[in-house]
Amino acid sequence: MNTQTTPSPQFYLTAPAACPYLPHEMERKVFTHLVGPRAAEMNDILTQGGFRRSQNIAYRPACESCRACVSVRILAQEFEPTKSMKRVLAANSDVIATEFTAQPSSEQYSLFRRYLDFRHQQGGMSDMTVLDYAIMVEDTHVNTRIVEYRRREEGSGLEQRPTGELLAAALTDTMSDGLSMVYSYFNPDLERRSLGTFMILDHVRRAKALGLPHVYLGYWVQGSRKMDYKTRFQPQEHLTPRGWERFDPSSMPESPHD
């Protein structure tokens, strides 16, 4: 009697490289490939274990001298927006969010390029070409969608495919226990709209509507100002050596936003 078994995933370790978040630190990552019939199942398990997806790779930090990167997920069903978040929702009441299959467009890349050039000129993604962007969007073996956020045009009906200005977009995985925001970007000239916050709020709304408990935000790095925004979305859980634990925001310095 022959018994066929699914091969176990193979994990690899990257060479040390400069940390993009904390000066004077070196980063290493452990990673595996998300391919085959169990890719979605593995993505669920690994994301719940602190991994992130990039194309067909799942990775997590494996740094020798630092444990600053902490996986964060919002408890979507308990979430209520703060006063400042309600103002963000009001400021974007003219925005239509539409979900599509993970297919890239030249319009998306143009906005993505503007975002990188303004926000991440020195980052590891700064030299991404249109082909690189297409691979980032399409190279997935899990349930990945792209959500476009467009300005509503005067006289456009809700039943029509929105054609207004593309303001932002989010590449998102739908998992068994939540939504994972893989990558998002927006028009950097529209700072007053707080589009990054708006997209997270919209994903919480989507998770609630789907009955999913979590929205995964990736890693929070205490001491990195560019990551501070993630702790504003309460309640949330952080992945610790003891498992997922509810985060106590009173342990953080007071936020100037509320």
From Swiss-Prot:
Its EC number is 2.3.2.29. GO terms for molecular function: arginyl-tRNA--protein transferase activity; leucyl-tRNA--protein transferase activity. It is an enzyme of class 2 (transferase). It holds the Pfam family ATE_N. Its main location: cytoplasm. Keywords: Acyltransferase, Cytoplasm, Transferase. It is found in: Cytoplasm. One of its GO terms (cellular component) is cytoplasm. Signal peptide: none annotated. It comes from the Bacteria. GO terms for biological process: ubiquitin-dependent protein catabolic process via the N-end rule pathway. It catalyses: N-terminal L-glutamyl-[protein] + L-leucyl-tRNA(Leu) = N-terminal L-leucyl-L-glutamyl-[protein] + tRNA(Leu) + H(+); N-terminal L-aspartyl-[protein] + L-leucyl-tRNA(Leu) = N-terminal L-leucyl-L-aspartyl-[protein] + tRNA(Leu) + H(+). PANTHER family: ARGININE-TRNA-PROTEIN TRANSFERASE 1, ARGINYL-TRNA--PROTEIN TRANSFERASE 1. Functions in the N-end rule pathway of protein degradation where it conjugates Leu from its aminoacyl-tRNA to the N-termini of proteins containing an N-terminal aspartate or glutamate. Belongs to the R-transferase family. Bpt subfamily. This is Aspartate/glutamate leucyltransferase. The lineage of its organism: Bacteria, Pseudomonadati, Pseudomonadota, Alphaproteobacteria, Hyphomicrobiales. The gene is bpt.
